[in-house]
Amino acid sequence: MIISILACTSAGGIGNKGTLPWPKNSEDLKWFKEHTTGQIVVMGRNTWDDKMMPKPLPNRTNCVVSNRLIDNINVRRLKGNIKQEVLNLQAQFPDKNVFIIGGKTIYEHTQDIVEIVYLTRMLKSWGADTKVNLERLLMNHRIKTVKPGTDCTYETWVRQT
């Protein structure tokens, strides 16, 4: 299954100056870890380069979309057609979920093949210089569950058939 997982502001803000717009949120990090551990994570080069992110993410197959070499033997580099690369991963590892974890360009290029979106919506306003179009990202999906968090809500969206 191909799944997008992201946290954003109500305006779709996902990044500010190369990192998350809000301070570390342990509750959201736990949610992310619970869903992605043991699975495949696909990210863009800017997400990989975020200083706040451990490299590689432990107990996951890390894949980075980049035309440049990745200086880490524990990472698989993807290049070319992002959507096709993700579909290839799904075919290669049918027993695993492929999680799209950012950034903006990776979400945009894969939104047509994503079956589930795990969306953490931050309740406070945070300045962001990178935003996703939530309306477009969630198009053809319907909300399945909403769980309240401390400073956020956890939403699960599923593709309509």
List each model region and its residues.
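Enzymes that bind and transform nitrogen-containing heteroaromatic metabolites
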Residues: 1-161
